[in-house]
C-alpha cells in the first residue's frame, strides 16, 4: 500500500525513465485500505504524469473481484485490461487455500470476469497459478473459462498469464507436489497458443532468462522487463525490504538488457498501446485478430514505439541494434501506403515528435 499519491507519482516517473509505456496496477483486498476510490484516484494520478518524453499510455488493473458497478467505474477511469487470476479452478482446493476473507467465495471470484464484461470492460486477462492443483485440471479450467467468455460475450480473454509456483517469502516451491517441470510448462504454453490463438500470452520475471527464451518460441507474446515486486521498488535507489516482495524475481535484467536480448533473438520489442486508444478492444479486436488484419497495425506500431524507446532511453548498443532491425522490418511492411506513412512517422520521431499510431 502506498501512503500517498506522491509515492505513486515517484514510482511512475521511475518507470517512465526506464522507458515503460504501460503498467499493471496491483492492489490488495483490504476493504478499507484499498477501496475502489483509492484505486480510481491512483489511476488518475498515473495517467496525469508526463515526465520528459515519458507517459504511461495504458494502465492495466489487477484488483480483487468486485461488483458490476465498480467495474463500470474502472472502465470510465480508462483502464486497459482488467486482470484477475483464478489461482486454481478446483473448488475444494481453492476453498482450502482461502477459508476466510474477501477471496473465500469461490463462485464470486470465478464469475468476476462476467461481471467485468457486464460493467463494460471488454479486455480481460485470466490465468491460473500452475502448481496449486494438478496442471491438467487447471489447464482445462482455463480453456473452458476462455470458451465461456467468448460464447457469452463474443469476446475471449485479451490476455492469458501462465505463472507457476515459485519461491517467495515463507514459500518453498518444493512444498507443492503439483509444481510443474520446465517441460510441462513449455507444453502448456504451446497448447494454449494453439487453442486460443487470438490471445496475448504473458510471462513474468518469475521465470529465468533461459525459460523465457524457450517459451517465446512457443507462443508467449508479452514479457516484463526490469520488474520489481516490492512496494516502492522502482523509486528506491536500493531495493527495499524483501518482506514486501510478492515473489522472487528470477530474471533480474534491466529493461534495456531485455530489449537488447530480444533484438539479438530477432524479435521486435514493442511498446505499443494503440489498440486500446483507438477503440480496438473487445469484439472489434477479436475480429481483427482472427482475420489477421491486426498485422496491418501491429507491425508498424511496434516499429514506431521501438523507435521512441531507442531515441529516449536505450543504451548505444541497444540503439544500434534496434535501428538496424527497424530499417530491415520497415521494408517488409506489405501495404505500400502504410509503409510510406510509417517511414515518415519514424523520421518525425527521430526529429523529436512522439506518439504516432495506426
Can you say where each PLM-predicted feature lies in the sequence?
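Radical SAM enzyme core and accessory elements
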Residues: 213, 218-221, 227-358
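Generic secondary-structure signature for well-ordered alpha-helical cores
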Residues: 17, 48-51, 118, 148-151, ...
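Core AdoMet radical
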Residues: 2-11, 15-116, 122-126, 130-132, ...
